[in-house]
Amino acid sequence: MKEANLLIDLRGEPGINCNGFCKFCYFRKVNKNNPQPFGCRYCQFTVGCDYCMYSVREINGDFIPLPFALMELQSSLLFKRYSKVNLTAGGDVSCYPQLEELCKAINNIGLKIHLGYTSGKGFDNVEIAKNLVDYGVDEVTFSVFSTNPKLRKEWMNDKNAETALKCLRYFCENCEVHCAIIVIPGVNDGEELKKTVSDLVDWGANAVILMRFANSEEQGLILGNAPLIEGIKPHSVEEFKNIVDEIHNEFGDYIRVTGTPLHDPVAGTPFALAKEENSHILERLKDKINGEATIITGNVAYPFLKKIFDETSVNVVKVNKDIADLITAKDLEKLDLKDVKETVFIPPKAFVHDRVAEEILRRDGVDRIVVRGVEQLTLDGEVSGIYTREEALKFEIEAFEELIGMINFFGMKKQ
């Protein structure tokens, strides 16, 4: 059985512990004074908890001191065996002041290291990358944006752009490297994007995920900070999917290409079950449904779920929010309840208190049962890159079997 990775969160905050905000950062322009809670699945009796008030805004405080990180490491190892340590942070891991010392200490214990999501903005010397590899770093997740240092300086606030890219190249030559590129229309798309991915292929990167830029509340900026950049109109979901396909078709033989919110051309996600080639599997799943329910989702998942539950006793309705996990109480308030059945499934990670969701969805006098759905029905491009087509389909089958079981348990039975 594969041993799990130990996650060590070094804390820190975007904009403070990352050498300054990138222009496109999801957390830029967020007002951290007197944050108001959204409500979420972790809230107890009242609306508001650490997660939906502070964590969602990455209000974490400064980096934790090195002794605290080592103490967390040692205490975790008392109870479970791990093969690798995943270093992550609310700030940028590369900006952690004792990163080399921490990695050296982890290496002395005999564990390998994954540098979680980093932009490399804290690396001011390529020797740092070499030392980290010597200290056991064998996997890196790197936010690239572009291999053009001028674009990194302008859009990522990267004062060490050339050095950061040299470090990235060294990591690519010596580690497993997964790269991320937030794609902004007219800035780093088109030929710039192809040049960046071509460089990553030449350097030896293992995978690249293209991430659609969000610039409005319905696209996912729920923290009151939209727009991030005035005058930029993000790609539509379909335009973005076409970009992912184009990059995959040109470079997919040399590097794994995925996209979020759409899609993974190799794994066939999200919602591989909606593909015609899997219709026979879908029909078998549909035959197991004997309850009635409504599923509330977002713009991206809606056409897939609508197709999956077509001609069943389950209907799917959407709110005007691209990503279902970012649905808030405000979105639910705009729903026309005439299409909502007596059992309602909301996304498990939706930012709404359970009691508030019930009040909103019962405002027409119908005493509806409100249930949070299955944790993950499909694989997003951020995680699907390590799955084969068969593994991704198996994941979805198991997830939908769980959901159907919940529908049959909570849903009003068909007459």
UniProtKB/Swiss-Prot annotation:
Top-level lineage group: Archaea
Needed cofactors: [4Fe-4S] cluster
GO BP, sorted A to Z: methylation
GO MF entries: 4 iron, 4 sulfur cluster binding; metal ion binding; methyltransferase activity
Residues that bind [4Fe-4S] cluster: 18, 22, 25
Pathway noted in the entry: Protein modification
Catalytic reactions on record: L-arginyl-[methyl-coenzyme M reductase] + AH2 + 2 S-adenosyl-L-methionine = (5S)-C-methyl-L-arginyl-[methyl-coenzyme M reductase] + 5'-deoxyadenosine + L-methionine + A + S-adenosyl-L-homocysteine + 2 H(+)
Record text on cofactor binding: Binds at least 1 [4Fe-4S] cluster. This cluster is coordinated with 3 cysteines and an exchangeable S-adenosyl-L-methionine.
Residues annotated as domain Radical SAM core: 2-256
Pfam name, any one: Radical_SAM
E.C. number: 2.1.1.379
Keyword Endoplasmic reticulum: no
Uppermost EC category: transferase
Family in the record: Belongs to the radical SAM superfamily. MCR alpha subunit C-methyltransferase family.
Function as written in the Swiss-Prot or TrEMBL entry: Radical SAM methyltransferase that is responsible for the C(5)-methylation of 'Arg-274' of the methyl-coenzyme M reductase (MCR) subunit alpha McrA. This post-translational methylation, despite being not essential in vivo, plays a role for the stability and structural integrity of MCR.
Name of the protein in its database record: [Methyl coenzyme M reductase]-L-arginine C-5-methyltransferase
